[in-house]
């Protein structure tokens, strides 16, 4: 929410989002006599009688060994049970001043969990407290709400652990509004000034602990234009990763295309103009988090105004957005949402890039089914990274490189020149092992410059973040020197590394000059800025050195006065400065000393002179810390202003990291550089599955050839169960995809024609929630393929029609095969147990039969996993059943029945 210019920035009281407070302004009354954790800034009315030392651990249940017996009557509330469960049930005028303020803020954020800073805790009340205690397993306690109200529900989290707890809330889909203290000392008789400083939602977080390092965190917004009659649905989609600054927009037709795009992107949060109680539309994937918004930010006029204000433009014509009005409206709604959830000051606005317009045909299309079947980024069985294609080929060393490779896999290229540029760089890196190793050595310790720059631009970066930025920028000239020795030209992004921006090197020098090498996590306790940077800070430090000298002299002087050689002048964070002597010497101290504390073996004293000097030291230290904080904020603002060029360099580093990793995989895996063509041919010699071959330990992978698209559009693949047909299908799809991201591929040689889409139908299960049987799921997937495949598509089918009667299934499989080979002309591999489909090859010249070989030795069956021309005549299903452990009598009876049926 907006704040006046006089209010401090979000972290004026915090080193980072949840860090230590800003140095307090020096005060003549400041002393160290108050405990560090005391809530001395809170009035009794604010704290209530129950605030002191309440428990923070989860209450034990009977199964956890609780020694307390359960209540005799569960319906009878205990004395401490809150009387009110929702703030709307109360008259605000009857609440205490603090709770009245809480309710006012909650009314502005009814859909979010409100965390309200009270001393060392963030507290929740009413319904939020009940929900927080349930979700985070915290103790639900109560607080006096007013004389006429009694106790209200309360739960809280320590402020130093707030990031961890908020991360868990965000992970579970909640949004959080943070109300922080905006001053350290209240006006007499008034509450501390507090206000909402941040709103955390799944799509807007910037904190490292709330983000997945190796995947983008997309915030998306959609505008849908209702279909008129039989006209297709028109929609515009805007997506932004606020942590990296990337912005994309697109405008399309057809609700299935919208569903496919949303499923592929997997945004953390989707915004749309709708009422809170609106049902989830059919085009929205079930697992996607929907955030309804008012329609105003999405209106054409308001959206255009928001974009002009954000990008500082008088016209949007230069962005190309007027030609995509629905996408423009979606982006306007997205930026409006960010304005409501992020700081609005010019020096702390999240730096977002100019939107990139994604056109139809820019990338190979992968629907959710294909992504799942090919196991691109997660396994089909348990949704884990290990065992996926990304796991097999990701050898990136930086988080931004990992995100880059993932984006490439999710949107393979269709432009042959762009593919060839990537592949040429991979080839250079494969051939130059020393270059590859040198680059990887430079990349290994590099921080996430993309997100670090974003945090700096938003005003949330800490001192260690800036040091990490400097370290990364200092490595750019070293990368340049290495690259120029082997690579002289390349794509536009590579020029960022071959000719780095000199302003970035200057920025790195500035950071190194001003910040110490290993700054503390807190921004409030000093030790951030080098000596010699600021005359005022140097003067304050010199005065503090003088005070240290006085303390040392005072210690020696008091020893001589008392004759106690073991006397020590020490400091404690809670009690301040004191003179410590042993118990035995306590009677020898002067009478003007004042006893401060008694310990088992030691007595501690203060003197008027020491106390007066302590106040002076604390004032100097507070002024020095305040000055360091001001200097740091100036430096952070300077770094944030350079967020755009830092991110440009970071993207170049990320691409280099991804390509170097692909080069490493290619060199160690015996891959080849595929020949990329504009034709339809797919010729692979001795191709292998990139994941399966890495997981084989005791046996070698059996390579196979592929011939598609040049005379043969449809391959009918037959063979026994468990012989490797599905693996062969997936292998073809993965190699097609790898070639189109610019990678080398696992084969002896490869010629790959660019595909516009990859379709897979491999296995099916019941969708009980949607009321669909296995057969209906299979037919729906098949229908999708037949409606959208073209002659440039690659179609991989593993069985069609097996969920119904034999002749029905065969008829469907035959008709589908004819349509794919004839009307559509798609490059297709169809694995089937319907051996009758082998007859298609005699009817159509563009159909070929292949089989997976098997060898019989007596009753044993040996799978050779080798694909060879010709059709199989048997499926060996009974033999496969025997190998799977089906009881022998059942196997014998199955053979008898088979003999009878085939007689």
Swiss-Prot record:
Pfam families: MutS_I, MutS_II, MutS_III, MutS_IV, MutS_V. One of its GO terms (biological process) is mismatch repair. Residues 1-89 are annotated as: Disordered. One of its GO terms (molecular function) is damaged DNA binding. ATP binds at residues 719-726. Residues 20-36, 49-62 have a biased composition (Low complexity). One of its GO terms (cellular component) is cytosol. Keywords: ATP-binding, DNA damage, DNA repair, DNA-binding, Nucleotide-binding. This protein is involved in the repair of mismatches in DNA. It is possible that it carries out the mismatch recognition step. This protein has a weak ATPase activity. Belongs to the DNA mismatch repair MutS family. This is DNA mismatch repair protein MutS.
């Amino acid at each position: 929410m907006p704040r006046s210019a006089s209010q401090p920035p979000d972290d004026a009281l915090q080193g980072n989002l949840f860090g230590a407070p800003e140095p307090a302004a020096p005060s003549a009354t400041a002393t160290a006599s108050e405990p560090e954790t005391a809530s001395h800034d809170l009035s009794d009315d604010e704290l209530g009688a129950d605030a002191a030392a309440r428990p923070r651990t989860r209450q034990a249940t009977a199964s956890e060994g609780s020694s307390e017996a359960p209540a005799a009557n569960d319906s009878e509330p205990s004395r401490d049970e809150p009387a009110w469960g929702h703030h709307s049930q109360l008259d605000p005028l009857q609440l205490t001043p603090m709770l009245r303020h809480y309710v006012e803020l909650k009314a502005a954020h009814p859909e979010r969990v409100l965390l309200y800073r009270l001393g060392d805790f963030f507290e929740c009340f009413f319904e939020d407290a009940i929900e927080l205690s349930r979700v985070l397993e915290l103790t639900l306690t109560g607080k006096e709400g007013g004389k006429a109200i009694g106790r209200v529900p309360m739960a809280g989290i320590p402020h130093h652990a707030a990031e961890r707890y908020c991360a868990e809330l965000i992970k579970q889909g909640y949004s959080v509004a943070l109300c922080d203290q905006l001053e350290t000392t209240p006006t007499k008789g008034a509450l501390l000034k507090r206000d909402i400083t941040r709103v955390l939602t799944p799509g807007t977080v910037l904190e490292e602990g709330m983000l997945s390092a190796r995947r983008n965190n997309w915030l998306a917004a959609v505008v849908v234009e209702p279909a008129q009659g039989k006209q297709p649905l028109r929609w515009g989609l805007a997506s932004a990763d606020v942590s990296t600054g990337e912005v994309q927009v697109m405008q399309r037709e057809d609700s299935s295309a919208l569903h496919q795009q949303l499923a592929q992107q997997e945004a953390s949060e989707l915004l749309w103009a709708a009422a809170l109680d609106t049902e989830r539309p059919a085009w929205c994937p079930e697992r996607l988090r929907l955030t309804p918004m008012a329609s105003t930010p999405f209106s054409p006029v308001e959206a255009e105004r928001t974009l002009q204000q954000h990008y500082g433009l008088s016209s949007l014509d230069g962005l190309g957005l007027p030609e995509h009005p629905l996408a423009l409206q979606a982006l306007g709604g997205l930026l409006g949402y960010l304005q409501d959830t992020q700081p609005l000051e010019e020096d702390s606005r999240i730096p977002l890039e100019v939107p990139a317009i994604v056109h139809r045909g820019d990338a190979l299309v992968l629907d959710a089914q294909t992504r799942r079947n090919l196991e691109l980024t997660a396994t089909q069985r348990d949704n884990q990274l290990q065992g996926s294609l990304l796991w097999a080929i990701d050898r990136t060393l930086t988080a931004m490189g990992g995100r880059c490779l993932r984006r490439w896999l999710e949107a393979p290229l269709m432009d042959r020149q762009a593919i060839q540029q990537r592949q040429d760089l991979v080839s250079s890196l494969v051939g130059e092992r020393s270059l590859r190793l040198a680059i990887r050595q430079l990349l290994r310790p590099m921080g996430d410059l993309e997100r670090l720059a974003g945090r700096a631009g938003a005003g949330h970066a800490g001192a260690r973040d800036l040091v990490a930025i400097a370290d990364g920028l200092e490595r750019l000239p070293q990368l340049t020197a290495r690259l120029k020795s082997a690579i002289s030209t390349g794509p536009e992004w590579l020029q960022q590394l071959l000719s780095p921006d000199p302003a970035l090197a200057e920025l790195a020098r500035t950071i190194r000059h001003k910040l110490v090498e290993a700054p503390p996590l807190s921004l409030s306790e000093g030790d951030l800025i080098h000596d010699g940077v600021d005359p005022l800070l140097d003067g304050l430090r010199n005065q503090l050195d003088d005070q240290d000298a006085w303390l040392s002299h005072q210690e020696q002087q008091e020893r001589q006065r008392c004759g106690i050689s073991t006397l020590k002048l020490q400091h404690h964070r809670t009690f301040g400065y004191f003179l410590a002597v042993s118990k035995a010497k306590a009677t020898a101290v002067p009478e003007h000393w004042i006893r401060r504390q008694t310990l088992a073996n030691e007595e501690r004293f203060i003197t008027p002179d020491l106390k007066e000097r302590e106040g002076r030291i604390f004032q100097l230290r507070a002024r020095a810390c305040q000055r360091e904080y001001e200097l740091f904020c100036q430096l952070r603002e300077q770094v944030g202003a350079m967020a755009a060029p830092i991110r440009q360099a970071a993207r170049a580093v990320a691409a280099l990291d991804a390509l170097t990793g692909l080069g490493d995989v290619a060199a160690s895996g015996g891959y080849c550089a595929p020949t990329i063509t504009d034709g339809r041919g797919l010729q692979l010699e001795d191709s292998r599955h990139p994941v399966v071959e890495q997981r084989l330990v005791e046996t070698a992978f059996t390579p196979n050839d592929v011939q598609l698209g040049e005379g043969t559009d449809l391959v009918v693949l037959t063979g026994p169960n468990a012989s490797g047909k599905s693996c062969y299908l997936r292998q073809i799809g993965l190699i097609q995809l790898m070639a189109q991201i610019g990678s080398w591929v696992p084969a002896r040689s490869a010629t790959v024609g660019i595909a516009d889409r990859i379709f897979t139908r491999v296995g099916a299960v019941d969708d009980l929630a949607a009321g669909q049987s296995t057969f209906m799921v299979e037919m729906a997937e098949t229908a999708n393929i037949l409606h959208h495949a073209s002659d440039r598509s690659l179609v991989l089918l593993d069985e069609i029609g097996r969920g119904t009667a034999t002749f029905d299934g065969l008829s469907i499989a035959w008709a589908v095969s004819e349509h794919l080979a004839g009307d559509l002309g798609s490059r297709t591999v169809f694995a089937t147990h319907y051996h009758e489909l082998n007859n298609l090859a005699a009817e159509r010249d563009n159909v070929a039969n292949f089989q997976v070989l098997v060898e019989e030795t007596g009753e044993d069956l040996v799978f050779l996993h080798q694909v060879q021309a010709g059709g199989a005549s048997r499926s060996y299903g009974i033999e496969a059943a025997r190998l799977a452990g089906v009881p022998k009598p059942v196997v014998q009876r199955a053979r008898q029945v088979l003999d009878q049926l085939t007689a």
